[in-house]
Amino acid sequence: MSDIILKGKVHKYGSNVNTDEIIPARYLNTTDPTILSKYCMEDIDKNFVKNVKAGDIIVAENNFGCGSSREHAPIAIKASGISAVIANSFARIFFRNSINIGLPILESQKAVKAIENGDAVEINLTKGIIKNITKNESYQSQPFPEFMQKVIKSGGLLGYIKS
């Protein structure tokens, strides 16, 4: 399998970004990714949707995706154009939901500490290498097992099952 490479600008957040901040409950009357993406992160970053470009990357501190167990949160993030999320740690249900919908998430304390908002970052998902292009630094994260890489490359669990 060829390496999966992602590249984008960083949008950085702190600790305990919860699912209600990622996609507020008032928008949970739909599962349409396009609609959800319009409101992604609006309660903590009013300009998120306006500033995100396809391929961009979220970097956050601890316990990203905590709170309610809603699949809407990773769907909104992915549909907004974000290609991956890097954090010190993730809420476990958010971690599982992200993989299930094909949103790559990586844990790397060194990367989170060094990467700043607006930095250009390249991720080699296959090898678990996070490269800060802006600072010319690299950080190692745990690469996904081959099976999970196939799930992500297929766009999520449903895409993997269909392929």
Curated annotation (Swiss-Prot):
Single biological process term from Gene Ontology: L-leucine biosynthetic process
HAMAP family listed in its UniProt record: LeuD_type2 (MF_01032)
Record's function text: Catalyzes the isomerization between 2-isopropylmalate and 3-isopropylmalate, via the formation of 2-isopropylmaleate.
EC number annotated for this UniProt entry: 4.2.1.33
Gene: leuD
NCBIfam families referenced in this protein's UniProt entry, alphabetically: leud (TIGR02084), LEUD_arch (TIGR02087)
Alphabetically ordered keywords of this record: Amino-acid biosynthesis, Branched-chain amino acid biosynthesis, Leucine biosynthesis, Lyase
Protein name, entry field: 3-isopropylmalate dehydratase small subunit
Gene3D superfamilies: Aconitase, domain 4
Metabolic or biological pathway: Amino-acid biosynthesis; L-leucine biosynthesis; L-leucine from 3-methyl-2-oxobutanoate: step 2/4
Molecular function in Gene Ontology: 3-isopropylmalate dehydratase activity
Family matches, as InterPro entries: Aconitase/3IPM_dehydase_swvl, AconitaseA/IPMdHydase_ssu_swvl, IPMI_Swivel, LeuD, LeuD/DmdB_bac, LeuD_type2/HacB/DmdB
CDD domains: IPMI_Swivel
Cited Pfam families: Aconitase_C (PF00694)
Similarity field: Belongs to the LeuD family. LeuD type 2 subfamily.
Quaternary state and interactors: Heterodimer of LeuC and LeuD.
Catalysed reaction equations from the record: (2R,3S)-3-isopropylmalate = (2S)-2-isopropylmalate
